[in-house]
Amino acid sequence: MAATTDTEHQEQAGTGGRGRRRPGRIAAQAVSVLGELLITAGLVMGLFVVYSLWWTNVVADRAADKQAEKVRDDWAQDRVGGSGQDGPGALDTKAGIGFLHVPAMSEGDILVEKGTSMKILNDGVAGYYTDPVKATLPTSDEKGNFSLAAHRDGHGARFHNIDKIEKGDPIVFETKDTWYVYKTYAVLPETSKYNVEVLGGIPKESGKKKAGHYITLTTCTPVYTSRYRYVVWGELVRTEKVDGDRTPPKELR
């Protein structure tokens, strides 16, 4: 048998070394894969945040503007046609019943529609409650609570600056024929999302003990969460008839 040479020993040793993976190399590869996964997850989360807090606002603003334009066009046609005031029921249209103006929130005019479902609020509007407590529309002239909700973040974020409202600040609701001017009298920065008593005809925790003409604004809190509810209450101080130029009340000038 021929003797094994030194060269053969070296080749065999080299071949055996290539067959084994060093623990350090495996760990490095695992860390690399994990890093790539984390970067991908971060990008996905970033895109989701952009979608939730920016793109949904764009879509909602477009929808709200379109619906608001329809409401104002309908009002203008009614006046030109000489139909005059059609009564409370006629205001409750699919497109919206009127516009909310809250100078402290700097949101301009906010279209108000019937209902507080996500389907309604996601269009960048405020909605009045029909469940679990039914809101009393100011156009009914009945005592009660005109309770409203809107998103705090995303989908138009109409009540994003609700925390800027202070006692004494005006809240104005505009219909085809009337301006309803309310004055903020109480704020509840945080309460359970299940606390429906704040929506009652005589809203609990607002300090009121007798029936009156109230308005309630509700939204999620803290910002970017839906854990609790932020509540603002106002009381009607006067009404003004809408003139031909739709001159706003002094609180909005």
Swiss-Prot record:
Pfam families: Sortase (PF04203). The active site is at 220. Gene3D superfamilies: Sortase. Residues 1-11 have a biased composition (Basic and acidic residues). It is a single-pass membrane protein. Residues 1-23, 69-89 are annotated as: Disordered. The chain crosses the membrane at residues 30-50. It catalyses: The enzyme catalyzes a cell wall sorting reaction in which a surface protein with a sorting signal containing a LPXTG motif is cleaved between the Thr and Gly residue. The resulting threonine carboxyl end of the protein is covalently attached to a pentaglycine cross-bridge of peptidoglycan. Its EC number is 3.4.22.70. It is an enzyme of class 3 (hydrolase). Keywords: Cell membrane, Hydrolase, Membrane, Protease, Transmembrane, Transmembrane helix. Disruption phenotype: No visible growth phenotype for the single srtE2 deletion, but considerably less ChpC is attached to the cell wall. A double srtE1-srtE2 knockout grown on minimal medium has a more severe delay in aerial hyphae formation than a single srtE1 knockout and does not make spores, on rich medium the double knockout initiates aerial hyphae formation later than wild-type and does not make spores. Induction: Transcribed independently of the operon's upstream, overlapping gene (SCO3851); transcribed with srtE1 over the first 72 hours of growth. Part of the strE1-srtE2 operon. SUPFAM superfamilies: Sortase. GO terms for molecular function: peptidase activity. Belongs to the bacterial sortase family. Class E subfamily. NCBIfam families: class_E_sortase, sortase_fam. Transpeptidase that anchors surface proteins to the cell wall. Recognizes Leu-Ala-x-Thr-Gly and Leu-Pro-x-Thr-Gly, with a preference for the former. Unlike the S.aureus sortase it cleaves not only the Thr-Gly motif but also the Ala-X bond; an Ala-Glu bond is a better substrate than the Thr-Gly motif in vitro. Among its possible substrates are the chaplins ChpA, ChpB and ChpC; this enzyme is more important for ChpC attachment than is SrtE1. A double knockout mutant of srtE1 and srtE2 shows a developmental defect in aerial hyphae formation more dramatic than that due to chaplin deletion. This is Sortase SrtE2. It comes from Streptomyces coelicolor (strain ATCC BAA-471 / A3(2) / M145).
